[in-house]
Regions:
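Catalytic phosphate/metal-binding cores of nucleic-acid and nucleotide-processing enzymes, i.e., regions
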Residues: 1-125
């Protein structure tokens, strides 16, 4: 089975994200990342995960990719199955799917408690 890479939508693909506002997708899209995802999809399963409705992301990215000649296909994942394995199709969900790698603008790489405590002592200051 091919490993899965999970990309967050807001702050990663949807750049310039500055809060929910009215719920629309108002920022710029990282077109270079979408093109790179096309390349990655040859070796990995690709998933986009977000708090947004998956339907909104699929409709937006389908239109964006058609307009910009980006060869990606998107499909809403079945929320009863958190594993994605459709070759060449990007799964989209508002759940946290199984993945080998998570790409997120707000993540922390946890290695051990000592380093996490040190990070937390400076967090939010």
């Amino acid at each position: 089975m091919r490993p899965t890479i999970v990309f967050d939508f807001d702050g990663v693909i949807h750049k310039g994200y500055d809060g929910w506002r009215d719920g629309s997708i108002y920022g710029e899209i990282d077109e270079g990342l979408l093109n790179y995802m096309t390349y990655l999809s040859q070796m990995y399963n690709i998933v986009i995960s977000s708090c947004r409705p998956a339907t909104q992301i699929v409709m937006f990215l389908d239109a964006y990719c058609r307009k910009n000649d980006i060869d990606l296909e998107f499909e809403i994942m079945d929320d009863r199955n958190m594993f994605w394995s459709k070759y060449g199709v990007v799964g989209v969900t508002n759940m946290k799917p199984a993945g080998a790698l998570y790409v997120d603008d707000r993540g922390f790489r946890y290695d051990n408690l000592k380093d996490f405590i040190k990070f937390m002592e400076g967090f939010g200051r």
